[in-house]
Structure formats: structure tokens, C-alpha cells
Amino acid sequence: MSGLPDLRNQFFFPRFSSLPLDAGFLTLYDDSDDDFIAFDKSKPRFQNRSPRKHWCIFAEIVQENRWPIRPVYQVKDLSGRQSLVSFNFDDRSLFADVARKCKVGYTLCIMYAERHQFADGNEGVRVEQPDAVKVLPVSLRELLATSDVFRASIKANHASTDTAACSNCYKPAAHRCSRCSLSEYCSKECQTQHWAKKHKKDCQVLRQLKLWNAFDWHRYDVRRGMNDFV
């Protein structure tokens, strides 16, 4: 069944402590992460893992750690636990985009994240694929609030035939935002005001929520990537 689950649902949006262990950890702990990963015993080690479902961790940036080799950030998840996120792209030219987009207070959304132990003993997430991560210009609290509004509006749109209200002044709406196709407005003036006041940030979040709403999180079919760095 397609549709975006509640972002507080830890089955699809786990906290760091619940993430599956990456291949490096599994050299220390031969553990099967049944909720996330299926293991094929007939294949060689490190080539025998495939996702059972889609999942994504949300991590708000609290500090930039200045490493000379790659971008590394101190982050917190929805439980408040802090850990590291390291960007390990093969294409190092993308690191300038990472530095430009990743700001303290913004939220990293990392698909298919796994727990990694770094050489210094710290734990975190190692992001190797550019399409695995999305940077949203909102805090975790703002992300949850926008998601709640989005999910409520999807249900309301299915149930109601009433004319939608302008997102700025609440008069009857005449057109939608061309970017997210979700926020509605009675006039160009109201749309311009709302963009400057709130929607510039919300629009990016709503577009991502809309993409996540289009597939079934319970069943892994194809890799669901994101386009910030691809």
C-alpha cells in the first residue's frame, strides 16, 4: 500500500540506535538485522545483503566537524541522541555542494542508513551514495509539523469536495503552487507574500513528502534515491 507513514513511526523512520549494522560492524558482530536486511547465505560475505523494506533516518545538524578529507557533521536524531554523519562520496567535487547545503539546524534525510563505526571508535552513518541523502532547510520539529499538515491534507482532499482555502489569507483558492502542487492561493499577491513568509522552506519539504507518499514503504522494490547531489 502506497502512502507516507507517520514520520514518528520507528519501523520506517528508525532512530540511530535501531539502525541495521553495516558490513564493517558485521565483521565484529555476526548479527542478522531481520527488520531491515535480508541475508542470502548462498552469496559471498558483504555481497549477500538486500533491503526488506524502505527506511530513512532523520538527523538534525548540530555542529560541523572540520575534517580535512571530507565533510563530517555532528547530528541528533528524533530521540535526541547525537552521532556523526560522514560524507564519503567517490566524487569529491560534490563536497562543495555538501558544505553549501548543510547548515546547523537543517535536517539530513538518509535513505537505507546503516550504523558505522569510524576508526576513532565513534559511531554514526557513512553516506557513500550521493542519491541516498536529502538536505531539508528545516529542523526536526519543523519537519514533523509540516509532515503532519501534509498527511492531514491528503486525507482531507480524499474526503472533501469543498473549495480549498488560500494558504495565506484563507479565502477561496484559485490556483496551486507550481512547484509542490499542494499549497493553494487566491491570487499571485498572496502567493508571493506566503513564499517570502513561510512557503519558500515548506515547499522543499512538501515536494519531498509528496515523493515519499508515492510508494509502498513496506515492500522494497527498487532503490528510492533523492536528487540533491546527483
Regions found by a protein language model. Give the residues of each.
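Short alpha-helical interaction motifs and adjacent low-complexity tails used for partner binding
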Residues: 1-230
